[in-house]
Amino acid sequence: MTPAAFKRSIRDLQVWCSSCMVALSGSDPIGVLIGAKRPSGTLVHKIAVHPAHRRQGHARHLLASLSSKLAILGPPRIIAEVPETLASACELFRASGYVQEALLTDYVFSSPGDFVPPTPSDASASAKAAADLAGRFVIPVTVDDLAANGLLGETHPQVWMRSVETLTARKDDIAGLAVASDERIEAHLLYVKPGIGLEGSAEAGPPASPLPVEIVSLRTFVEDDGDRLKQLLSRLGAQGMEPFRFPKVHPAEISKELLETLGFRPAGVHRLYAARARSDSSSFQS
Protein backbone atom coordinates (compact mmCIF):
# COMPACT_ATOMS: atom_id res chain seq x y z
CA MET A 1 0.00 0.00 0.00
CA THR A 2 1.42 3.36 -1.05
CA PRO A 3 1.11 6.59 0.99
CA ALA A 4 -1.32 7.93 -1.63
CA ALA A 5 -3.47 4.80 -1.39
CA PHE A 6 -3.49 5.02 2.40
CA LYS A 7 -4.67 8.64 2.25
CA ARG A 8 -7.45 7.66 -0.15
CA SER A 9 -8.53 4.82 2.14
CA ILE A 10 -8.94 7.32 4.98
CA ARG A 11 -11.41 9.26 2.85
CA ASP A 12 -13.09 6.37 1.05
CA LEU A 13 -13.21 3.66 3.73
CA GLN A 14 -12.98 5.74 6.92
CA VAL A 15 -9.68 4.24 8.07
CA TRP A 16 -9.06 5.46 11.64
CA CYS A 17 -5.59 5.91 13.05
CA SER A 18 -6.92 4.70 16.43
CA SER A 19 -7.81 1.39 14.75
CA CYS A 20 -4.36 0.96 13.21
CA MET A 21 -1.57 -0.86 15.05
CA VAL A 22 2.07 -1.82 14.54
CA ALA A 23 3.85 -4.78 16.14
CA LEU A 24 7.50 -4.16 17.00
CA SER A 25 10.52 -6.34 17.65
CA GLY A 26 12.78 -3.94 19.48
CA SER A 27 12.59 -0.85 17.29
CA ASP A 28 11.81 -2.78 14.10
CA PRO A 29 8.22 -2.91 12.79
CA ILE A 30 7.30 -6.53 12.05
CA GLY A 31 3.51 -6.43 11.75
CA VAL A 32 0.70 -4.04 10.92
CA LEU A 33 -3.08 -3.90 11.22
CA ILE A 34 -5.10 -1.23 9.41
CA GLY A 35 -8.70 -0.82 10.55
CA ALA A 36 -11.60 1.21 9.19
CA LYS A 37 -14.38 2.24 11.56
CA ARG A 38 -18.01 3.28 11.13
CA PRO A 39 -20.98 3.30 13.52
CA SER A 40 -21.93 -0.17 12.23
CA GLY A 41 -18.58 -1.75 13.07
CA THR A 42 -14.88 -2.00 12.31
CA LEU A 43 -13.31 -3.56 9.22
CA VAL A 44 -9.91 -5.22 9.42
CA HIS A 45 -8.79 -3.70 6.12
CA LYS A 46 -5.21 -4.99 6.13
CA ILE A 47 -3.20 -7.26 8.41
CA ALA A 48 0.32 -8.46 7.66
CA VAL A 49 3.40 -9.81 9.43
CA HIS A 50 6.98 -9.82 8.14
CA PRO A 51 7.83 -13.28 6.71
CA ALA A 52 10.69 -13.73 9.17
CA HIS A 53 8.33 -13.31 12.12
CA ARG A 54 5.30 -15.35 11.09
CA ARG A 55 3.86 -18.24 13.12
CA GLN A 56 4.84 -16.49 16.35
CA GLY A 57 1.40 -15.14 17.33
CA HIS A 58 1.94 -11.53 16.25
CA ALA A 59 -1.14 -11.37 14.00
CA ARG A 60 -3.39 -12.86 16.71
CA HIS A 61 -1.96 -10.37 19.19
CA LEU A 62 -2.82 -7.48 16.85
CA LEU A 63 -6.40 -8.76 16.50
CA ALA A 64 -6.71 -9.25 20.26
CA SER A 65 -5.41 -5.73 20.93
CA LEU A 66 -7.94 -4.27 18.51
CA SER A 67 -10.71 -6.26 20.18
CA SER A 68 -9.75 -5.01 23.64
CA LYS A 69 -9.73 -1.41 22.45
CA LEU A 70 -13.11 -1.69 20.69
CA ALA A 71 -14.66 -3.37 23.73
CA ILE A 72 -14.14 -0.03 25.47
CA LEU A 73 -14.52 2.49 22.64
CA GLY A 74 -16.95 0.61 20.37
CA PRO A 75 -18.45 -0.30 18.05
CA PRO A 76 -18.29 -3.96 19.12
CA ARG A 77 -18.74 -5.59 15.70
CA ILE A 78 -15.52 -6.47 13.86
CA ILE A 79 -15.46 -7.91 10.34
CA ALA A 80 -12.92 -9.02 7.76
CA GLU A 81 -13.37 -9.79 4.06
CA VAL A 82 -10.65 -12.35 3.32
CA PRO A 83 -9.82 -13.82 -0.12
CA GLU A 84 -10.54 -17.54 -0.06
CA THR A 85 -7.17 -18.16 -1.71
CA LEU A 86 -5.35 -16.84 1.38
CA ALA A 87 -5.72 -20.02 3.42
CA SER A 88 -3.39 -18.85 6.19
CA ALA A 89 -5.36 -15.62 6.64
CA CYS A 90 -8.65 -17.53 6.78
CA GLU A 91 -7.18 -19.83 9.41
CA LEU A 92 -5.95 -16.81 11.40
CA PHE A 93 -9.44 -15.39 11.72
CA ARG A 94 -11.02 -18.76 12.52
CA ALA A 95 -8.39 -19.41 15.19
CA SER A 96 -9.02 -15.94 16.61
CA GLY A 97 -12.71 -16.68 17.17
CA TYR A 98 -14.21 -15.13 14.06
CA VAL A 99 -17.24 -16.83 12.51
CA GLN A 100 -17.87 -16.98 8.78
CA GLU A 101 -21.11 -15.14 7.97
CA ALA A 102 -21.21 -15.31 4.18
CA LEU A 103 -19.31 -15.94 0.98
CA LEU A 104 -18.77 -12.83 -1.14
CA THR A 105 -18.38 -13.62 -4.84
CA ASP A 106 -16.39 -11.68 -7.43
CA TYR A 107 -18.15 -11.67 -10.80
CA VAL A 108 -16.78 -10.76 -14.21
CA PHE A 109 -18.44 -10.01 -17.51
CA SER A 110 -15.59 -10.64 -19.90
CA SER A 111 -17.01 -9.42 -23.19
CA PRO A 112 -19.92 -6.98 -22.96
CA GLY A 113 -19.60 -6.22 -26.67
CA ASP A 114 -20.39 -9.84 -27.48
CA PHE A 115 -23.30 -10.08 -25.06
CA VAL A 116 -26.44 -11.57 -26.57
CA PRO A 117 -29.47 -11.91 -24.27
CA PRO A 118 -30.98 -15.39 -24.04
CA THR A 119 -33.44 -16.05 -26.84
CA PRO A 120 -37.07 -16.05 -25.59
CA SER A 121 -38.87 -19.35 -25.95
CA ASP A 122 -41.47 -17.79 -28.19
CA ALA A 123 -42.24 -14.58 -30.07
CA SER A 124 -44.79 -13.42 -27.50
CA ALA A 125 -42.16 -13.32 -24.76
CA SER A 126 -39.90 -11.19 -26.95
CA ALA A 127 -42.73 -8.84 -27.77
CA LYS A 128 -43.66 -8.55 -24.09
CA ALA A 129 -40.08 -7.59 -23.15
CA ALA A 130 -39.97 -4.93 -25.87
CA ALA A 131 -43.34 -3.54 -24.83
CA ASP A 132 -42.27 -3.46 -21.19
CA LEU A 133 -39.30 -1.24 -22.06
CA ALA A 134 -41.31 1.06 -24.32
CA GLY A 135 -41.55 4.56 -22.94
CA ARG A 136 -38.46 4.06 -20.78
CA PHE A 137 -35.28 6.07 -21.14
CA VAL A 138 -31.63 5.41 -20.36
CA ILE A 139 -30.28 8.45 -18.54
CA PRO A 140 -27.03 9.32 -16.75
CA VAL A 141 -27.26 9.33 -12.96
CA THR A 142 -24.96 10.19 -10.08
CA VAL A 143 -24.67 9.00 -6.51
CA ASP A 144 -26.38 12.22 -5.42
CA ASP A 145 -29.28 11.59 -7.83
CA LEU A 146 -29.91 8.15 -6.36
CA ALA A 147 -29.60 9.44 -2.80
CA ALA A 148 -32.10 12.22 -3.54
CA ASN A 149 -34.58 9.59 -4.74
CA GLY A 150 -34.06 7.39 -1.69
CA LEU A 151 -32.43 4.61 -3.71
CA LEU A 152 -29.18 4.24 -1.75
CA GLY A 153 -30.67 2.96 1.48
CA GLU A 154 -29.23 -0.04 3.32
CA THR A 155 -31.98 -2.38 2.14
CA HIS A 156 -29.70 -5.39 1.80
CA PRO A 157 -26.25 -6.46 3.02
CA GLN A 158 -23.44 -4.55 1.35
CA VAL A 159 -19.71 -4.98 1.58
CA TRP A 160 -17.60 -2.18 3.00
CA MET A 161 -16.18 -0.96 -0.31
CA ARG A 162 -19.66 -0.59 -1.84
CA SER A 163 -21.62 0.63 1.18
CA VAL A 164 -23.57 3.89 1.12
CA GLU A 165 -20.79 5.58 3.09
CA THR A 166 -18.13 4.52 0.58
CA LEU A 167 -20.23 5.45 -2.45
CA THR A 168 -20.93 8.86 -0.96
CA ALA A 169 -17.26 9.44 -0.17
CA ARG A 170 -16.26 8.40 -3.70
CA LYS A 171 -19.11 10.10 -5.54
CA ASP A 172 -16.79 12.25 -7.66
CA ASP A 173 -15.10 9.06 -8.93
CA ILE A 174 -18.37 7.31 -9.81
CA ALA A 175 -20.68 7.61 -12.82
CA GLY A 176 -23.90 5.80 -13.58
CA LEU A 177 -26.77 4.94 -15.89
CA ALA A 178 -30.42 4.34 -15.10
CA VAL A 179 -33.58 3.17 -16.81
CA ALA A 180 -36.30 5.67 -15.98
CA SER A 181 -39.98 6.10 -16.75
CA ASP A 182 -41.90 9.35 -16.48
CA GLU A 183 -42.50 8.56 -12.81
CA ARG A 184 -39.39 6.94 -11.35
CA ILE A 185 -36.01 5.27 -11.72
CA GLU A 186 -36.63 1.57 -12.36
CA ALA A 187 -33.06 0.23 -12.48
CA HIS A 188 -29.58 1.64 -12.13
CA LEU A 189 -25.91 0.82 -12.56
CA LEU A 190 -23.04 2.69 -10.91
CA TYR A 191 -19.42 2.22 -11.95
CA VAL A 192 -16.02 3.69 -11.16
CA LYS A 193 -14.87 6.06 -13.88
CA PRO A 194 -12.08 4.52 -16.00
CA GLY A 195 -8.60 5.37 -14.75
CA ILE A 196 -9.64 5.64 -11.10
CA GLY A 197 -9.37 2.88 -8.54
CA LEU A 198 -9.77 2.58 -4.79
CA GLU A 199 -6.00 2.39 -4.33
CA GLY A 200 -5.01 4.64 -7.22
CA SER A 201 -5.98 7.88 -8.87
CA ALA A 202 -6.50 9.42 -12.26
CA GLU A 203 -3.26 11.34 -11.83
CA ALA A 204 -1.29 8.09 -11.82
CA GLY A 205 -1.82 7.78 -15.57
CA PRO A 206 -3.32 4.97 -17.65
CA PRO A 207 -2.34 1.37 -16.92
CA ALA A 208 -0.26 -0.68 -19.32
CA SER A 209 -3.37 -2.67 -20.30
CA PRO A 210 -7.08 -1.90 -19.94
CA LEU A 211 -8.46 -2.62 -16.48
CA PRO A 212 -11.96 -4.02 -15.91
CA VAL A 213 -14.66 -1.44 -15.33
CA GLU A 214 -15.62 -1.83 -11.68
CA ILE A 215 -19.36 -1.92 -11.03
CA VAL A 216 -20.22 -0.70 -7.53
CA SER A 217 -24.02 -0.91 -7.63
CA LEU A 218 -26.39 -2.92 -9.82
CA ARG A 219 -30.05 -2.83 -8.87
CA THR A 220 -33.48 -3.20 -10.37
CA PHE A 221 -36.75 -2.23 -8.73
CA VAL A 222 -38.97 -4.02 -11.27
CA GLU A 223 -39.57 -7.75 -11.76
CA ASP A 224 -38.56 -8.04 -15.42
CA ASP A 225 -36.14 -11.00 -15.59
CA GLY A 226 -33.24 -8.55 -15.75
CA ASP A 227 -34.33 -6.79 -18.97
CA ARG A 228 -33.61 -3.29 -17.64
CA LEU A 229 -30.21 -4.28 -16.29
CA LYS A 230 -29.36 -5.93 -19.62
CA GLN A 231 -30.19 -2.65 -21.32
CA LEU A 232 -27.85 -0.74 -19.01
CA LEU A 233 -25.00 -3.24 -19.43
CA SER A 234 -25.41 -3.19 -23.19
CA ARG A 235 -25.31 0.61 -23.21
CA LEU A 236 -22.15 0.67 -21.11
CA GLY A 237 -20.51 -1.96 -23.30
CA ALA A 238 -21.41 0.03 -26.42
CA GLN A 239 -19.32 2.89 -24.99
CA GLY A 240 -16.24 0.65 -25.14
CA MET A 241 -16.04 0.07 -21.39
CA GLU A 242 -15.11 -3.57 -21.04
CA PRO A 243 -14.71 -5.98 -19.41
CA PHE A 244 -16.86 -5.51 -16.29
CA ARG A 245 -15.98 -6.54 -12.75
CA PHE A 246 -18.54 -6.72 -9.92
CA PRO A 247 -16.57 -7.54 -6.74
CA LYS A 248 -17.57 -9.03 -3.40
CA VAL A 249 -21.28 -9.59 -4.07
CA HIS A 250 -23.21 -10.68 -0.98
CA PRO A 251 -25.71 -13.49 -1.74
CA ALA A 252 -28.56 -11.36 -0.33
CA GLU A 253 -27.63 -8.40 -2.52
CA ILE A 254 -28.49 -9.86 -5.93
CA SER A 255 -29.08 -13.47 -6.87
CA LYS A 256 -26.51 -15.64 -8.58
CA GLU A 257 -29.20 -16.72 -11.04
CA LEU A 258 -29.93 -13.15 -12.12
CA LEU A 259 -26.24 -12.34 -12.53
CA GLU A 260 -25.76 -15.43 -14.68
CA THR A 261 -28.77 -14.42 -16.76
CA LEU A 262 -27.11 -11.03 -17.30
CA GLY A 263 -23.92 -12.71 -18.51
CA PHE A 264 -21.72 -12.59 -15.39
CA ARG A 265 -19.68 -15.53 -14.16
CA PRO A 266 -17.98 -16.11 -10.78
CA ALA A 267 -14.24 -15.45 -10.72
CA GLY A 268 -13.28 -15.46 -7.05
CA VAL A 269 -14.55 -15.64 -3.48
CA HIS A 270 -13.98 -13.71 -0.26
CA ARG A 271 -15.02 -15.05 3.13
CA LEU A 272 -16.85 -12.60 5.37
CA TYR A 273 -15.76 -13.19 8.97
CA ALA A 274 -17.25 -11.44 12.01
CA ALA A 275 -16.70 -11.26 15.76
CA ARG A 276 -17.72 -9.07 18.68
CA ALA A 277 -15.08 -7.20 20.62
CA ARG A 278 -14.27 -8.33 24.16
CA SER A 279 -12.03 -6.86 26.81
CA ASP A 280 -10.76 -10.39 27.48
CA SER A 281 -8.05 -10.45 24.81
CA SER A 282 -7.73 -14.23 24.94
CA SER A 283 -11.02 -14.86 23.17
CA PHE A 284 -13.73 -13.39 20.96
CA GLN A 285 -17.49 -13.62 21.01
CA SER A 286 -19.16 -14.40 17.69
Regions found by a protein language model. Give the residues of each.
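Conserved active-site alpha-helix within GNAT-family acetyltransferase domains
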Residues: 60, 84-103, 250-268
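Conserved acetyl-CoA-binding loop-helix of GNAT-fold acetyltransferases
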Residues: 49, 55-68, 95, 222-238
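Amide-forming acyltransferase catalytic core, primarily the GNAT-like/NAT-type
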Residues: 1-3, 95-209
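Active-site-proximal cofactor/substrate-binding loop regions of enzyme domains
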Residues: 1-66
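A short helix-loop-beta-strand connector motif used in the catalytic cores of GNAT acetyltransferases and
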Residues: 8-22, 28-31, 43, 165-178, ...
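Conserved acetyl-CoA binding element of GNAT-fold acetyltransferases
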Residues: 40-52, 198-224
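Conserved GNAT acetyl-CoA-binding A-motif
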Residues: 70-83, 239-250
